[in-house]
Amino acid sequence: MKHLFKLDPAKNLPMNDLTKLVHSGTNGFIIGGTDNVQIEAVQKLYELLGETDLPIFLEISNESMILPEADHFLIPVVLNTENSKWTHGLHQELIKEMGAFIPWKRVTAEGYVILNKDAKVAHLTEAKTDLTDEDIVAYARLAENIFHLPIFYVEYSGMYGDPEVVRKASAALSNTKFWYGGGIRSKEQAAEMAKYADTIIVGNIIYEDLEKALETATIFRKKTV
């Protein structure tokens, strides 16, 4: 997967726009949000996407995101925080409550590094965002070699990141997949980050300028003879 659209269930998106996203050339969708997420909205969005053959991932930020019938669950593990609530605390509580019913084969953990100090998610998780390139590379190696996480996700959350940071962190990984999200608002930015990331995630621009969002996916569309 080179490209995923991230949809916020707390935001409205017309069905016609959703159809355009499905046929844009993207490789799939993440449904996720930081706040004001209601299970009814999650279910409605999931059902609207249900007829596509593209993978749909539910990124679980809180219990209100849990939809038992979902095919894929993403579990964020925030690496650059000293608040254990976001590295394993909430995770342990949920497993204690629901462990016997969790479909583990459909669950994938993501090692998150959040780098936009002004983002809601940075404030919520108390993320330490003033990191050097060396810090971020070390987190990448931690994710792969100590925690054996399948995904290392660098999240600039609304702000376009530093391609050099992405290049260095990606180069430090051998087996863990590198995902990049944050501030992609043009096909040029999409192409730039895709040079280094295994997968790029495009979110906010969907709700700001749909046509530009679509352009970020069309560059990955398979050409037919």
Swiss-Prot record:
Keyword Transferase attached: yes
Catalysed reaction equations from the record: sn-glycerol 1-phosphate + all-trans-heptaprenyl diphosphate = 3-heptaprenyl-sn-glycero-1-phosphate + diphosphate
Binding-site residues for sn-glycerol 1-phosphate, renumbered to this chain: K6, Y153, V154, E155, Y156, S157, G158, G183, G203, N204
Cofactor(s) of this protein: Mg(2+)
Family membership noted in the UniProt record: Belongs to the GGGP/HepGP synthase family. Group I subfamily.
Species of the source: Listeria monocytogenes serotype 4b (strain F2365)
Pfam families per the UniProt record, alphabetical: PcrB
Signal peptide start-end: none
Role description: Prenyltransferase that catalyzes in vivo the transfer of the heptaprenyl moiety of heptaprenyl pyrophosphate (HepPP; 35 carbon atoms) to the C3 hydroxyl of sn-glycerol-1-phosphate (G1P), producing heptaprenylglyceryl phosphate (HepGP). This reaction is an ether-bond-formation step in the biosynthesis of archaea-type G1P-based membrane lipids found in Bacillales.
UniProt entry keywords in alphabetical sequence: Lipid biosynthesis, Lipid metabolism, Magnesium, Metal-binding, Phospholipid biosynthesis, Phospholipid metabolism, Transferase
Residues where Mg(2+) binds: D8, T34
Protein's pathway: Membrane lipid metabolism; glycerophospholipid metabolism
Protein name (Swiss-Prot/TrEMBL): Heptaprenylglyceryl phosphate synthase
